[in-house]
Curated annotation (Swiss-Prot):
Zn(2+) 2 binds at residues 354, 357, 365, 370. This is Protein nanos. A motif (C2HC 1) lies at residues 319-346. Posterior part of the embryo. While the transcript is present throughout the embryo, nanos translation is controlled by smg, and the protein is found in pole plasm and pole cells. In the female ovary expressed in germline stem cells, precystoblasts and in maturing cystoblasts; in early cystoblasts expression is post-transcriptionally repressed by bam in a 3'UTR-dependent manner. One of its GO terms (biological process) is negative regulation of synaptic assembly at neuromuscular junction.
């Protein structure tokens, strides 16, 4: 139809150039009416075959040139407000939400890392503080132990008497008592009652006085008092001697004749001690040794060993070890080899160290009496017996000369 109209318009144009005849004038008029109707309907003006344009400003045009509205084509009023790509808009919103979530998780991770670093720093500070406190405590313990050791070894001014106490006790009981310090533990003594300084000073002054003296006589007889260190040594020796006497008396067997022996021993000790105490002098070591040896000798007399068909064996009252080593008579008779508790008393034997088991001190012994010695054959026994006989004969010859 559009083609036919164009052909008609072309014919009309030809007719205008070449005036048609009257026979064709009716057709031309009819053709012009068709073009006017078309122009009124669509607003299309044809000026020529080469130039074609759309006239949308015609006054007679009641329609607007716009694309047809289809279900696929969006509404122009709404398309201007929204994007042309709804799927891309949804993906952009999703991307923004994902980006926000990523940023939130990143900041949360940074915060957790900062908290972890702070906790590690606090733990390191606590560990360093604990190590420093432990080192300070160890240093304090070492310093305290060194201080105590220095006080014990060197002896401070206030503990000067205590440092000499051990020396005096060792000198007084050397060779006559064992080195067991547990028997003279003074820690079990009852605690002293707290007194005013004045009464305590008077009591100390009264302790330094001889027996039978009154502390009120200090002002009149101040020149006859004992020095404080000397009185302290005397008190310590007296206490040690009382411990020895009480221990020896407590282990005496219950026999009818032991009461007289105990009374005799107590009388001897009291007379010997009364000399020193009456004069205000410290007890001599000889008096202590005499009292302890008398009790030891009495205990040895009460012991009767029944061996070899109940034959009584005499207990030696001298040191056999010193006798075998050709010591002087005074040394031999001054002590015995062992005490009532089977502890070594001989000072020379106490210093001997057994080459087999390494025993010394209270359990010191020679190789002959070593419990860990190897089995001796008959040849070894014969050699030892011959050596013993030769040695005894040699000593006898020396004694005769």
């Amino acid at each position: 139809m559009f083609r036919s109209n164009l052909e008609g318009s072309g014919a009309a144009a030809v007719g205008v150039a070449n005036p048609p005849s009257l026979a064709q004038s009716g057709k031309i008029f009819q053709l012009q009416d068709n073009f006017s109707a078309f122009h009124a309907r669509g607003g299309l003006n044809i000026l020529g075959l080469q130039d074609m344009y759309l006239d949308t400003s015609g006054a007679n045009s009641s329609a607007t040139l716009s694309p047809p509205i289809t279900p696929v084509t969006p509404d122009p009023s709404t398309s201007a407000q929204s994007t042309h790509f709804p799927f891309l808009a949804d993906s952009a919103a999703t991307a923004n939400s994902l980006l926000m979530q990523r940023q939130y998780h990143y900041h949360l991770l940074l915060q957790q890392q900062q908290q972890l670093a702070m906790a590690q720093h606090q733990l390191a500070l606590a560990a360093s503080a604990a190590a420093a406190s432990a080192s300070h405590q160890q240093t304090d313990e070492i310093a305290r132990s060194l201080k105590i050791f220095a006080q014990v070894t060197t002896g401070a001014a206030e503990n000067a008497a205590g440092s000499m106490q051990d020396v005096m006790q060792e000198f007084a009981t050397n060779g006559y008592a064992s080195d067991d310090l547990g028997r003279m533990s003074y820690g079990s003594a009852p605690p002293q009652v707290q007194m005013p300084p004045q009464q305590q000073h008077q009591q100390q002054q009264g302790l330094h006085l001889p027996l039978g003296r009154n502390p009120a006589q200090l002002q009149t007889n101040g020149g006859n008092l004992m020095p404080i260190p000397l009185a302290t040594h005397w008190l310590n020796n007296y206490r040690e001697h009382l411990n020895n006497v009480w221990r020896n008396m407590s282990y005496i067997p219950a026999a009818p004749n032991t009461m007289g022996l105990q009374a005799q021993t107590a009388a001897t000790v009291s007379t010997n001690l009364g000399v020193g105490m009456g004069l205000g002098l410290p007890v001599q070591g000889e008096q202590l040794r005499g009292a302890s040896n008398s009790s030891n000798n009495n205990n040895n007399n009460n012991k009767v060993y029944k061996r070899y068909n109940s034959k009584a064996k005499e207990i030696s009252r001298h040191c056999v070890f010193c006798e075998n080593n050709n010591e002087p008579e005074a040394v031999i008779n001054s002590h015995s080899v062992r005490d009532n508790f089977n502890r070594v008393l001989c000072p020379k034997l106490r210093t001997y160290v057994c080459p087999i088991c390494g025993a010394s001190g209270d359990s010191a012994h020679t190789i002959k009496y070593c419990p860990k010695k190897p089995i001796i054959t008959m040849e070894d026994a014969i050699k030892a017996e011959s050596f013993r006989l030769a040695k005894s004969s040699y000593y006898k010859q020396q004694m005769k000369v």
